[in-house]
């Protein structure tokens, strides 16, 4: 095993001889998480034992000292989003073992990582011109964004923060765990109103804030990471806002990029019914892009669940039209919908559309029956 007797690892190993590299550095990263994955997949207790040794070493050497290294060898492993991964890795260790020390270490690490999230300058709504385009100041805000790597030599110095904000879903979960509003506010600041940084041709977000709307350049695989963190975030919001009456089990963290955890490996629950998330083209039309709409299908294929969430602090209204034939092999009964949170029956207007009004950061779930 590459794990050392004390539970730690070398930062890197030679490809051909297996000898440790970068021996002037310590591996202050959650490398032990690989054993968490192995234990969950294989069930052999030796992997859990190794994860415990590694996590305990990490807490002593990284968390207790407030010192972390990153994953980017081209920047001498300076601290980066691996610190965010450490939070989730320690939370997973708490879930596996029930040991309170891992939860405590996770929350301490989370508060340290929060200091690397941008909170300044505070944007306003004054009109500015940036790279030849007129816009309001908040449209290119840095608030809520994380950096690729920090310090005096990291990319944050030259390129600013990044738009790949993989911490958002985790920060929502940390708010649930701690009731510390800062986590939720930073997650929402990072996730919303980022259209100015989308590439006009691909609608993919630019990686570095400084590159504005140029897109990901030679890294198109960033699109997968964007899908991952966005999905993790919006479903985390749904889970939190519903008081966990909506819940979807997550898989493992994405390698390198951050603490996002994706779902889809097994069904979740939507107000007492097992369901799987779905994305069906042409399922519905809605007229307010500030309201997020998630969709799920119960495992018995008898109900469609639509989860509507207001992404702003203001009361909003949306008109929602559901298309009856959008799901192959089923017909959606659009004559009425049930609100499982209240037990109310909701009927559409004369035009067949549902009128939905949501308070600031509100949520409403609709369940529609499906027929063969």
Task: Tell where the protein language model's regions lie, with residue ranges.
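Structural signature of alpha-solenoid helical repeat scaffolds
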Residues: 19, 23-26, 43, 74, ...
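Carbohydrate-binding surface patches
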Residues: 172, 272-327
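Glycine- and aromatic-rich loop/turn segments at beta-sheet edges
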Residues: 2-20, 59-77, 117-153, 198-217
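Catalytic cores of secreted or luminal carbohydrate-active enzymes
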Residues: 224-284
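Well-ordered alpha-helical scaffold segments within catalytic/enzyme domains
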Residues: 30-45, 85-99, 154-155, 163-180, ...
